[in-house]
Each structure stands twice: as C-alpha cells, then as structure tokens.
UniProtKB/Swiss-Prot annotation:
Species name: Dictyostelium discoideum
Keywords: Nucleus, Ribosome biogenesis, RNA-binding, rRNA processing
Domain RRM intervals: 110-193
Stated name of the protein: Putative pre-rRNA-processing protein esf2
Matches recorded under Pfam families: RRM_1 (PF00076)
Function: May be involved in the small subunit (SSU) processome assembly and function, and in the 17S rRNA synthesis.
Keyword Nucleus: yes
A molecular-function term among this protein's GO annotations: RNA binding
Annotated signal sequence range: none
UniProt keyword RNA-binding present: yes
GO BP of this protein: endonucleolytic cleavage in 5'-ETS of tricistronic rRNA transcript (SSU-rRNA, 5.8S rRNA, LSU-rRNA); endonucleolytic cleavage in ITS1 to separate SSU-rRNA from 5.8S rRNA and LSU-rRNA from tricistronic rRNA transcript (SSU-rRNA, 5.8S rRNA, LSU-rRNA); endonucleolytic cleavage to generate mature 5'-end of SSU-rRNA from (SSU-rRNA, 5.8S rRNA, LSU-rRNA); small-subunit processome assembly
Subunit architecture: Component of the 90S pre-ribosomes.
Subcellular location: Nucleus, Nucleolus
Length: 296
C-alpha cells in the first residue's frame, strides 16, 4: 500500500510538471516504465546516502585518531618534562672513619705556588706538563685581565697547584725552578722558565678562605658605592620636589617666579693682544714691504 501511494504521488507530481499539451502522449506510455525509473532513482538516492554516511564516519574516525595521537604526544611530552626535572639529591652525613681518611689525605697533599704563567698557556697544557712528574689533584689560576672577555682572555698571572704527595711537590719545586719548560722545537713555551715555590703548611682550605675573604671585601665595597649613589639620588629628588613646591606657592600668591641667574664674565685681553694693538700701522706696512722685496 505504501509503495502504491508513493507511485501515485510520483505520477501526480509528474503530471503537474508536464505541459498540458503533451499530456496525451505520456498517458500512452506504460506505468511500468515510470515504476522502473522511480525505483532506480530511489535506489541511487539510498546508495548515495549510504556512501555519504560512510564518508562522514571515516572522517570522524580520522579526526578521533588524530585527537588520540595528539593526546599521546602530549602525554609523552609531559613524561619527558617530568624526567628532565632535576631530582633532589639528599646529602648524607659522613662517617667518622671517612672524615679521618679525608683529613689524612689532605695532610699528605702539598701545594706549589706558580708566580708567573707564560702567555697563551692554558690550564690543560700546564697540567699536562706537570703531570709528568706527579699526580695533580687541583689547580687554581688567576686571570691577568678580569675585564677582558672570556673567549679572548687567555692570560693568567699566577696560580696554585696541588699535588697528591707533599714530598714529591717539594722535589718538583726545587728541581724545576728556573729551568726551561722544554718540549718540541715548534712549541711556543719551550724556552720559558718555571717559577715555582713550595708552600709548607699551606693547605687548600687556606686558599679557599683567602678567596672568600677577598670576595666579601669586594662585595662590601660595591654595597657602599651603591648606597652612596642611592643617597645622592634621593637628595636630588628631594631638591626637585622642594623647588616644585616653592614654585607652586609663588604661583598661588601671584608672585613672579625668580629666573635662574646666569653669570657671564668678560675675558681679559692677553699680553700678546695688547702688544699687537700698540704696534702702529706704519710699522706693519714697513714689515710687509720688506718681506715683498725679499721675495722679489
């Protein structure tokens, strides 16, 4: 029944669309022809609708997969960030035995003072030269020009070198002092002399204390200078505010504001100018005429 109603509706719609002049010609056609065409159109419409739905489903699946991939990437980034976070290292207190061992090791170590370091000699090369004679544990070198940039600052003026054995450090200082460094023929520092001195009863913590005290003094000087500059700035600001306040008072009372006094002084004439002015014009003419005669 439903199909018959659909067919009747299709026929009536087609009749309404057809021009009345051609109605008789279309009435002669069989009803089956219209039925077949309508069925084919209906099937094609259904198939097209199914294809569109499948395409939409595929697009939804692709979008969903992309969202899942983005979420997975975000999770991986978060994991990487968590792994990058520095772990807090808890420092455990040392045992008494370890403390004793460290004290013994530090007591056995010896330090040599190097008063002059050749130009263009880097710490790695210096350590390589001294490591031939004994094991070097620590080094501290002072730059010659602190204000110079780091990538151009290759000059050191003095240094402290710590050896593992103090007896060996004493021997190295006595033997190598005022002796050429040696090396290959093309080496720049081949003919440079060692300037070494062994420091008895001098340990690495003494050097650290000295450096810390120097740093503290430098920081104190900087703070004092900064405080002085701040005080000067505050005084200037107070003076400016006072001048503004005074000007506002004068304006409210109707008094004229005093202009700043600019003092100018006449410059005295010099002794040479006075002598030149005293010379008469006749004398000048004679001098000029004599010069012209000599030239001719």
């Amino acid at each position: 029944m439903a199909q018959k109603r659909k067919n009747d509706k299709i026929e009536t719609s087609k009749k309404e669309e057809i021009d009345p002049r051609f109605v008789n010609k279309f009435e002669d056609l069989e009803e089956n022809d219209f039925k077949d065409d309508d069925e084919d159109d209906f099937i094609n419409d259904v198939n097209e609708g199914e294809e569109e739905e499948e395409e939409e489903d595929n697009e939804d699946n692709i979008e969903f997969n992309q969202e899942e991939d983005d979420e997975d990437e975000d999770d991986e980034e978060n994991k990487d960030n968590k792994n990058k976070i520095k772990k807090v290292i808890k420092i455990k207190p040392m045992d008494i035995e370890k403390m004793k061992k460290l004290k013994e090791q530090n007591e056995n170590k010896g330090i040599i003072y190097l008063s002059t370091i050749p130009s263009r000699m880097k710490p790695a090369k210096l350590k390589q030269l001294l490591a031939k004679y004994g094991k070097v544990t620590r080094m501290h070198l002072v730059r010659a020009n602190v204000e110079r940039k780091n990538h151009r600052n290759d000059m050191f003026k003095e240094g402290w070198i710590e050896f593992e054995d103090k007896a060996l450090a004493r021997k190295i200082a006595t033997i190598l002092n005022n002796i050429p460094m040696g090396g290959k023929a093309r080496d720049i520092h081949k003919d440079c002399l060692w300037n070494l001195r062994y420091l008895p009863k001098f340990k690495w913590h003494h050097l650290q204390d000295k450096l810390v005290s120097q740093r503290m003094e430098r920081d104190k000087k900087l703070r004092l200078e900064i405080n002085q500059v701040r005080k000067q700035n505050l005084i200037l600001l107070e003076q400016v505010e006072l001048s503004k306040h005074v000007n506002q008072k004068h304006e409210s009372k109707g008094k004229p504001i005093k202009e700043k006094v600019v003092r100018t002084f006449k410059q005295r004439s010099s002794h040479e100018d006075s002598l030149n002015s005293n010379i008469s014009s006749k004398v000048l003419e004679k001098v000029v005429s004599n010069k012209k005669q000599k030239i001719n």
